[in-house]
Protein backbone atom coordinates (compact mmCIF):
# COMPACT_ATOMS: atom_id res chain seq x y z
CA UNK A 1 0.00 0.00 0.00
CA UNK A 2 1.45 3.35 -1.01
CA UNK A 3 1.50 6.21 1.46
CA UNK A 4 -0.85 9.04 0.67
CA UNK A 5 0.91 12.38 0.49
CA UNK A 6 -1.42 15.29 1.20
CA UNK A 7 -0.25 18.65 -0.08
CA UNK A 8 -1.48 21.47 2.11
CA UNK A 9 -0.99 25.20 2.41
CA UNK A 10 -3.11 27.77 4.25
CA UNK A 11 -5.41 28.12 1.25
CA UNK A 12 -5.20 24.82 -0.67
CA UNK A 13 -5.54 21.20 0.47
CA UNK A 14 -4.87 18.55 -2.18
CA UNK A 15 -5.29 14.82 -1.57
CA UNK A 16 -4.05 12.41 -4.26
CA UNK A 17 -6.19 9.30 -4.81
CA UNK A 18 -4.54 6.01 -5.75
CA UNK A 19 -6.32 4.39 -8.67
CA UNK A 20 -5.53 1.16 -10.45
CA UNK A 21 -1.77 1.77 -10.51
CA UNK A 22 -1.13 -0.51 -7.59
CA UNK A 23 1.52 -3.16 -7.14
CA UNK A 24 -1.14 -5.85 -6.71
CA UNK A 25 -2.72 -4.99 -10.09
CA UNK A 26 0.68 -5.10 -11.79
CA UNK A 27 1.42 -8.45 -10.13
CA UNK A 28 -1.90 -10.00 -11.26
CA UNK A 29 -1.46 -8.63 -14.80
CA UNK A 30 2.03 -10.18 -15.00
CA UNK A 31 0.95 -13.53 -13.56
CA UNK A 32 -2.04 -13.79 -15.91
CA UNK A 33 0.16 -12.82 -18.88
CA UNK A 34 2.72 -15.53 -18.09
CA UNK A 35 0.03 -18.13 -17.48
CA UNK A 36 -2.06 -17.14 -20.49
CA UNK A 37 0.88 -17.15 -22.90
CA UNK A 38 2.06 -20.48 -21.47
CA UNK A 39 -1.34 -22.12 -21.96
CA UNK A 40 -1.67 -20.61 -25.44
CA UNK A 41 1.75 -21.90 -26.52
CA UNK A 42 1.01 -25.34 -25.06
CA UNK A 43 -2.28 -25.52 -26.97
CA UNK A 44 -0.69 -24.37 -30.22
CA UNK A 45 2.15 -26.87 -29.72
CA UNK A 46 -0.37 -29.70 -29.54
CA UNK A 47 -2.11 -28.43 -32.70
CA UNK A 48 1.04 -28.02 -34.82
CA UNK A 49 2.86 -31.02 -33.24
CA UNK A 50 5.88 -28.78 -32.78
CA UNK A 51 7.33 -27.68 -29.44
CA UNK A 52 6.73 -23.93 -29.01
CA UNK A 53 7.20 -24.00 -25.24
CA UNK A 54 10.74 -24.13 -23.91
CA UNK A 55 9.97 -25.62 -20.50
CA UNK A 56 8.24 -28.86 -21.52
CA UNK A 57 7.13 -30.68 -24.66
CA UNK A 58 3.34 -30.42 -25.07
CA UNK A 59 3.49 -31.41 -28.76
CA UNK A 60 2.48 -34.99 -27.86
CA UNK A 61 -0.83 -33.87 -26.30
CA UNK A 62 -3.94 -34.58 -28.42
CA UNK A 63 -5.43 -31.36 -29.70
CA UNK A 64 -9.02 -32.47 -29.16
CA UNK A 65 -9.95 -32.09 -26.27
CA UNK A 66 -6.83 -31.18 -24.20
CA UNK A 67 -5.11 -28.91 -26.73
CA UNK A 68 -8.32 -27.03 -27.53
CA UNK A 69 -8.95 -26.45 -23.82
CA UNK A 70 -5.37 -25.24 -23.34
CA UNK A 71 -5.75 -22.86 -26.29
CA UNK A 72 -9.06 -21.53 -24.96
CA UNK A 73 -7.61 -20.90 -21.49
CA UNK A 74 -4.53 -19.34 -23.05
CA UNK A 75 -6.60 -16.89 -25.09
CA UNK A 76 -8.76 -16.08 -22.04
CA UNK A 77 -5.70 -15.51 -19.82
CA UNK A 78 -3.98 -13.35 -22.43
CA UNK A 79 -7.12 -11.22 -22.91
CA UNK A 80 -7.51 -10.84 -19.13
CA UNK A 81 -3.88 -9.76 -18.89
CA UNK A 82 -4.30 -7.23 -21.71
CA UNK A 83 -7.34 -5.77 -19.93
CA UNK A 84 -5.49 -5.52 -16.60
CA UNK A 85 -2.49 -3.79 -18.22
CA UNK A 86 -4.84 -1.42 -20.08
CA UNK A 87 -6.58 -0.43 -16.83
CA UNK A 88 -3.18 -0.13 -15.11
CA UNK A 89 -1.78 2.28 -17.71
CA UNK A 90 -4.98 4.36 -17.80
CA UNK A 91 -4.88 4.61 -13.98
CA UNK A 92 -8.64 4.17 -13.75
CA UNK A 93 -9.93 5.61 -10.48
CA UNK A 94 -6.82 7.70 -9.84
CA UNK A 95 -7.03 11.43 -9.36
CA UNK A 96 -7.21 13.98 -6.58
CA UNK A 97 -9.46 15.95 -4.25
CA UNK A 98 -8.62 19.63 -4.09
CA UNK A 99 -10.10 22.07 -1.60
CA UNK A 100 -9.13 25.61 -2.61
CA UNK A 101 -10.04 28.57 -0.39
CA UNK A 102 -8.51 31.06 -2.86
CA UNK A 103 -10.94 30.19 -5.65
CA UNK A 104 -13.68 29.04 -3.27
CA UNK A 105 -14.06 25.68 -5.04
CA UNK A 106 -13.86 21.99 -4.29
CA UNK A 107 -12.56 19.87 -7.19
CA UNK A 108 -13.06 16.10 -7.31
CA UNK A 109 -11.04 14.70 -10.24
CA UNK A 110 -10.85 11.04 -11.34
CA UNK A 111 -9.60 9.16 -14.40
CA UNK A 112 -12.10 6.84 -16.07
CA UNK A 113 -12.17 4.42 -18.98
CA UNK A 114 -11.57 5.53 -22.56
CA UNK A 115 -14.62 7.12 -24.10
CA UNK A 116 -16.89 10.09 -23.76
CA UNK A 117 -16.54 10.26 -19.97
CA UNK A 118 -12.79 9.57 -19.72
CA UNK A 119 -12.22 12.37 -17.23
CA UNK A 120 -14.54 12.85 -14.28
CA UNK A 121 -14.28 16.35 -12.87
CA UNK A 122 -16.77 17.71 -10.32
CA UNK A 123 -16.50 21.26 -9.00
CA UNK A 124 -18.59 22.69 -6.18
CA UNK A 125 -18.48 26.03 -4.35
CA UNK A 126 -17.10 25.80 -0.82
CA UNK A 127 -20.23 27.46 0.56
CA UNK A 128 -22.32 24.46 -0.60
CA UNK A 129 -20.30 21.98 1.48
CA UNK A 130 -22.36 20.99 4.53
CA UNK A 131 -20.14 18.46 6.31
CA UNK A 132 -17.78 15.51 6.08
CA UNK A 133 -19.44 12.15 6.85
CA UNK A 134 -17.54 9.02 7.84
CA UNK A 135 -19.17 5.65 7.17
CA UNK A 136 -17.72 2.69 9.03
CA UNK A 137 -19.10 -0.83 8.59
CA UNK A 138 -17.21 -3.76 10.06
CA UNK A 139 -17.73 -7.44 9.38
CA UNK A 140 -17.02 -9.81 6.52
CA UNK A 141 -16.88 -7.01 3.95
CA UNK A 142 -15.66 -3.93 5.89
CA UNK A 143 -16.31 -0.48 4.50
CA UNK A 144 -14.60 2.71 5.65
CA UNK A 145 -15.39 5.72 3.50
CA UNK A 146 -15.33 9.51 3.87
CA UNK A 147 -18.14 11.36 2.12
CA UNK A 148 -18.46 15.01 1.20
CA UNK A 149 -21.98 16.27 1.92
CA UNK A 150 -22.97 18.88 -0.66
CA UNK A 151 -26.14 20.97 -0.60
CA UNK A 152 -28.80 19.69 -3.07
CA UNK A 153 -26.53 16.78 -4.11
CA UNK A 154 -25.87 13.27 -2.90
CA UNK A 155 -22.92 12.32 -0.74
CA UNK A 156 -19.68 12.16 -2.76
CA UNK A 157 -17.07 9.55 -1.73
CA UNK A 158 -13.62 11.02 -1.17
CA UNK A 159 -11.32 8.00 -0.78
CA UNK A 160 -10.27 5.26 -3.14
CA UNK A 161 -12.23 2.15 -3.97
CA UNK A 162 -10.84 -1.21 -2.96
CA UNK A 163 -9.21 -2.19 0.27
CA UNK A 164 -10.52 -0.23 3.27
CA UNK A 165 -8.14 2.27 4.82
CA UNK A 166 -7.16 1.82 8.48
CA UNK A 167 -9.54 3.40 10.99
CA UNK A 168 -6.88 5.75 12.41
CA UNK A 169 -6.06 7.05 8.93
CA UNK A 170 -9.76 7.58 8.17
CA UNK A 171 -10.19 9.56 11.39
CA UNK A 172 -7.09 11.66 10.68
CA UNK A 173 -8.16 12.44 7.10
CA UNK A 174 -11.68 13.34 8.19
CA UNK A 175 -10.48 15.54 11.06
CA UNK A 176 -7.89 17.29 8.87
CA UNK A 177 -10.46 17.98 6.17
CA UNK A 178 -13.14 19.18 8.62
CA UNK A 179 -10.61 21.44 10.34
CA UNK A 180 -9.38 22.88 7.03
CA UNK A 181 -12.92 23.60 5.78
CA UNK A 182 -14.26 24.53 9.26
CA UNK A 183 -17.26 22.24 8.87
CA UNK A 184 -18.57 19.44 11.12
CA UNK A 185 -17.39 15.83 10.93
CA UNK A 186 -20.25 13.34 11.22
CA UNK A 187 -20.24 9.63 11.91
CA UNK A 188 -17.28 9.22 14.30
From Swiss-Prot:
Cellular localisation: Cellular thylakoid membrane
Transmembrane segments: 26-48, 68-90
Main location: membrane
Membrane topology field: Multi-pass membrane protein
Biological processes, Gene Ontology terms: photosynthesis
Keywords, comma-separated and alphabetical: Membrane, Photosynthesis, Thylakoid, Transmembrane, Transmembrane helix
GO cellular component: a single term: plasma membrane-derived thylakoid membrane
One Pfam family named in its UniProt record: Ycf4
Function summary: Seems to be required for the assembly of the photosystem I complex.
Family per similarity comment: Belongs to the Ycf4 family.
Protein name: Photosystem I assembly protein Ycf4
Source species of the chain: Picosynechococcus sp. (strain ATCC 27264 / PCC 7002 / PR-6)
Gene: ycf4
